[in-house]
Every structure is written in structure tokens, then in C-alpha cells.
Amino acid sequence: MNMTKMAKANEIKREWVVLDAEGKTFGRLMTQVATLLRGKHRPDYTPHVDCGDFVVIVNASKVVFSGLKLEAKEYFTHSGYFGSTKSQTLQELLEKNPEKLFRLAARGMLPKTKLGRAMLKKLKVYAGAEHPHTAQVTK
């Protein structure tokens, strides 16, 4: 009887994937990123093991949104104190900190566990075209 092979954490060979966000739709790009971070594109995918690849996103500030999302969509933060709710529109967040925008979207698509936090650490986002990971990049 053949048993299904389960990947072990020390057997996984991770790759570095660079994605250029310029001119791409945000949501479609982020689903691709979540799949790569989770490792679901691999034949040895195991749900309880972090088997995803490192993902480097460049030109994050040049990503495209459909519809009126730039003006209408809002992101809220709350410190826990009364009256401390702050909101930013998508356009403000994209101009000030595009890295945070990509990290928030990826966090929503990954598991809400220790494993998900480990997966999120493998996401590297840069607003411009330059990144310091040229030595590691394989794809």
C-alpha cells in the first residue's frame, strides 16, 4: 500500500520569485502572491508545513485598481482607546505606504495562525523597481 508523502520542514527547497506589480490588477496579483506564499503551487504541498516560496514585489506603487476603489475604499485602525478610530482611503495608503497595503491584503488571504505569520514574513514589498534580493532570486 502506497502512502501519501508529506513534506517535512527541513526538506523544502524554497525559491525566490520576483513579481512586477506595474499595470497589474491588485486583487489578481495578490491571489497569485498568496498561492506562492502558501506553497499550493507545489506538488509536495502539505497544509500543516510552511512550504511556500519567498515573494518579492517591485513597483508596488504602480499597481492598478478597478472601479472607484481608490476614493471609496477605506482602511480603519483602532488603538483600543475611546475615540481613537482612524481611517485612510486606499489612495492615501497607496501614496504613503504601499508596502503596508500589500501586507494587509496578503494577511487577509493567509491562515490566521503561527504558520500564517511565518508565511507572511516571506513577503518582501518595494515601492520602486530596485530591491536588495538580487543575489537570492531564482525566478
From Swiss-Prot:
This is Large ribosomal subunit protein uL13. One of its GO terms (cellular component) is cytosolic large ribosomal subunit. Signal peptide: none annotated. It comes from the Bacteria. It comes from Wolinella succinogenes (strain ATCC 29543 / DSM 1740 / CCUG 13145 / JCM 31913 / LMG 7466 / NCTC 11488 / FDC 602W). Keywords: Ribonucleoprotein, Ribosomal protein. The keyword Ribosomal protein applies. Pfam families: Ribosomal_L13 (PF00572). This protein is one of the early assembly proteins of the 50S ribosomal subunit, although it is not seen to bind rRNA by itself. It is important during the early stages of 50S assembly. Belongs to the universal ribosomal protein uL13 family. GO terms for molecular function: mRNA binding; structural constituent of ribosome. One of its GO terms (biological process) is negative regulation of translation. Part of the 50S ribosomal subunit. NCBIfam families: rplM_bact.
